[in-house]
């Protein structure tokens, strides 16, 4: 293959050999395409070969399901998915817009995020998820690694591998979701305990954990289970305290009531994205982060 890997029919240019992202199911590379005098960049998600215990039909269904979800979503805070193609080695590849700023995990690790950036990225994530929920889709794997920065002050939600359609466009009622998925520190408590759950509320929980992590560069607890002492203490203090520990660590003070509602251990008490966006504190937060 040499130092470059070309996508079938050169529609999206040539891929760099070095990956910009690696996950359990795929590798992501940058593709360069010259269009007259302008260079266009795409992110190419190259899916790994199917597992031995998976049929070809199951494998293709999984890939096309993810593409069918992601390609119908069009919002400033959701990654734009362009195409699903095969390369010359018959690898399935998803073509997406390229984000020059890397992922939020890298930005948190660097420790360079300002308070206005943190608040704006939080609001933008809520807006992106609110849009997805309005389309009947829950993400179910919100974490810093799945939030990309475009370099112009916008956050983009990516990776719809475990997303769930909880309401078809012709339906009025929502379906409950099943299955434990996502990364343990961001998983809502009901996912550990219940067979079925409202996936919208799982997303709300995860966004709140991301906000905490952006601010403090650490997680509030290892897992939202009663076997975790920090989480157990939080649950016991929740009913009696206006700001149960560790929420007093968050600033400004005005954000704490909202975060408490988003991190309600009982999903019946947790707020949905409509309520989050109506919060007086969040209403005055900017939709765009000015890059530091």
Where are the language model's segments positioned?
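C-terminal lobe of the eukaryotic/viral protein kinase catalytic domain
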Residues: 87, 218-267
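Terminal C-lobe "cap" of eukaryotic-type protein kinase domains
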Residues: 265-269, 273-289
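Activation segment signature within eukaryotic-like protein kinase domains
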Residues: 121-122
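Conserved activation segment of eukaryotic-like protein kinases, specifically the C-terminal portion
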Residues: 175-191
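Short, small-residue-biased leader/transition segments that mark boundaries at the very start
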Residues: 2-6
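Glycine-rich ATP phosphate-binding loop
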Residues: 27-51
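A conserved loop-to-beta-strand element in the N-lobe of protein kinase catalytic cores
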Residues: 88-97, 105-106
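Short beta-strand micro-motifs within the conserved protein kinase catalytic domain, predominantly
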Residues: 80-90
């Amino acid at each position: 293959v040499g130092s470059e890997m070309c996508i079938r029919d050169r529609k999206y240019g040539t891929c760099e050999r070095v990956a910009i992202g690696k996950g359990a199911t795929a590798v992501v590379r940058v593709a360069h395409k010259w269009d007259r005098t302008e260079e266009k960049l795409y992110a190419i998600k190259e899916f790994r070969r199917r597992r031995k215990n998976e049929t070809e039909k199951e494998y293709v269904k999984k890939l096309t399901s993810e593409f069918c979800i992601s390609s119908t979503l069009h919002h400033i805070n959701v990654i734009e998915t362009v195409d699903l193609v095969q390369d010359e080695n018959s690898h399935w590849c998803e073509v997406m817009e390229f984000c020059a700023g890397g992922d939020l995990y890298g930005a948190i690790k660097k420790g360079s995020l300002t308070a206005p950036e943190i608040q704006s990225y939080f609001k933008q994530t809520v807006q992106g998820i609110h849009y997805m929920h309005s389309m009947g889709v829950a993400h179910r794997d919100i974490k810093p690694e799945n939030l990309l920065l475009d370099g112009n002050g916008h956050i983009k939600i990516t990776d719809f591998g475990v997303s769930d359609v909880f309401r078809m466009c012709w339906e009025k009622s929502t379906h409950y979701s099943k299955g434990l998925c996502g990364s343990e520190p961001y998983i809502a408590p009901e996912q550990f305990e219940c067979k079925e759950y409202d996936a919208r509320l799982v997303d709300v929980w995860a966004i709140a954990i991301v906000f905490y992590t952006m601010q403090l560069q650490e997680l509030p607890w290892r897992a939202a289970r009663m076997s975790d002492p920090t989480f157990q203490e939080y649950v016991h203090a929740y009913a009696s305290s206006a700001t149960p520990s560790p929420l007093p660590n968050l600033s400004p003070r005005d954000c704490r009531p909202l975060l408490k509602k988003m991190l309600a251990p009982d999903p019946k008490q947790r707020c949905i994205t409509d309520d989050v966006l109506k919060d007086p504190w969040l209403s005055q937060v900017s939709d765009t982060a000015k890059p530091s």
